[in-house]
């Protein structure tokens, strides 16, 4: 099934823009920039939206205006309005359980403690959507997670995350064509 909607999870606002938790939005923003596409605020959809077309595969790019933990409502509103099935959605998000700079494509699964994914699963009524997980590493103890994800990465970690984003963007044409197995083989290797 071809992907028709890519959502970059984030917390909106300049205070959060450069934090680890916004790695998903970094990728979606970079993808739009590489295709000379510009986001526009759509208050009805509760998001910044734009559209790209790669090899005759159109896709909407979304940056929710809500905080990460409420990303599901935006995802549901947009997917219902455009009649996009959960299996046609790619959620791009930060992942504590991957080392900094790793990136993995996954279909379905649980939320793994990620509140953005938890809300999307609840709002869509299913976890059967695709995820592009950008590794941000783990602070080592669960009590440090909140502060860690809302902090800025070091320059070294930031560069590793950017490198992962480049690898993620490289598979988007394959993802949009619907060949998830090939995309997984390429990016998960």
From Swiss-Prot:
<protein>
    <recommendedName>
        <fullName>Peptidyl-tRNA hydrolase</fullName>
        <ecNumber>3.1.1.29</ecNumber>
    </recommendedName>
</protein>
<comment type="subunit">
    <text>Monomer.</text>
</comment>
<feature type="active site" description="Proton acceptor">
    <location>
        <position position="21"/>
    </location>
</feature>
<dbReference type="GO" id="GO:0000049">
    <property type="term" value="F:tRNA binding"/>
</dbReference>
<keyword id="KW-0694">RNA-binding</keyword>
<keyword id="KW-0378">Hydrolase</keyword>
<dbReference type="InterPro" id="IPR036416">
    <property type="entry name" value="Pept_tRNA_hydro_sf"/>
</dbReference>
<feature type="binding site">
    <location>
        <position position="115"/>
    </location>
    <ligand>
        <name>tRNA</name>
    </ligand>
</feature>
<comment type="similarity">
    <text>Belongs to the PTH family.</text>
</comment>
<dbReference type="GO" id="GO:0006515">
    <property type="term" value="P:protein quality control for misfolded or incompletely synthesized proteins"/>
</dbReference>
<comment type="function">
    <text>Catalyzes the release of premature peptidyl moieties from peptidyl-tRNA molecules trapped in stalled 50S ribosomal subunits, and thus maintains levels of free tRNAs and 50S ribosomes.</text>
</comment>
<dbReference type="InterPro" id="IPR001328">
    <property type="entry name" value="Pept_tRNA_hydro"/>
</dbReference>
<dbReference type="GO" id="GO:0005737">
    <property type="term" value="C:cytoplasm"/>
</dbReference>
<feature type="binding site">
    <location>
        <position position="69"/>
    </location>
    <ligand>
        <name>tRNA</name>
    </ligand>
</feature>
<dbReference type="GO" id="GO:0004045">
    <property type="term" value="F:peptidyl-tRNA hydrolase activity"/>
</dbReference>
<feature type="binding site">
    <location>
        <position position="16"/>
    </location>
    <ligand>
        <name>tRNA</name>
    </ligand>
</feature>
<keyword id="KW-0963">Cytoplasm</keyword>
<dbReference type="InterPro" id="IPR018171">
    <property type="entry name" value="Pept_tRNA_hydro_CS"/>
</dbReference>
<comment type="function">
    <text>Hydrolyzes ribosome-free peptidyl-tRNAs (with 1 or more amino acids incorporated), which drop off the ribosome during protein synthesis, or as a result of ribosome stalling.</text>
</comment>
<feature type="binding site">
    <location>
        <position position="67"/>
    </location>
    <ligand>
        <name>tRNA</name>
    </ligand>
</feature>
<dbReference type="Pfam" id="PF01195">
    <property type="entry name" value="Pept_tRNA_hydro"/>
</dbReference>
<keyword id="KW-0820">tRNA-binding</keyword>
<dbReference type="GO" id="GO:0072344">
    <property type="term" value="P:rescue of stalled ribosome"/>
</dbReference>
<feature type="site" description="Stabilizes the basic form of H active site to accept a proton">
    <location>
        <position position="94"/>
    </location>
</feature>
<feature type="site" description="Discriminates between blocked and unblocked aminoacyl-tRNA">
    <location>
        <position position="11"/>
    </location>
</feature>
């Amino acid at each position: 099934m071809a992907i028709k909607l890519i959502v970059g999870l984030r917390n909106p606002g300049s205070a959060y823009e450069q934090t680890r938790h916004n790695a998903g939005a970094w990728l979606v923003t970079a993808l739009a920039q590489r295709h000379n596409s510009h986001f526009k605020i759509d208050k009805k959809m509760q998001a910044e939206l734009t559209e790209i077309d790669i090899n005759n595969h159109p896709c909407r790019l979304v940056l929710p205006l809500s905080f990460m933990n409420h990303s599901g409502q935006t995802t549901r509103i947009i997917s219902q309005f455009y009649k996009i099935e959960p299996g046609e959605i790619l959620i791009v998000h930060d992942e504590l359980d991957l080392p900094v700079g790793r990136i993995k494509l996954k279909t379905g699964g649980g939320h793994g403690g990620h509140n953005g994914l938890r809300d999307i699963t609840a709002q869509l009524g299913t976890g059967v959507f695709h995820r592009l997980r950008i590794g941000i590493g783990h602070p080592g103890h669960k009590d440090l997670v909140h502060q860690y994800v809302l902090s800025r990465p070091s320059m070294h970690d930031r560069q590793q995350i950017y490198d992962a984003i480049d690898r993620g963007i490289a598979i988007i044409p394959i993802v949009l064509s619907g060949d998830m197995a090939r995309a997984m083989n390429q990016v998960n290797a």
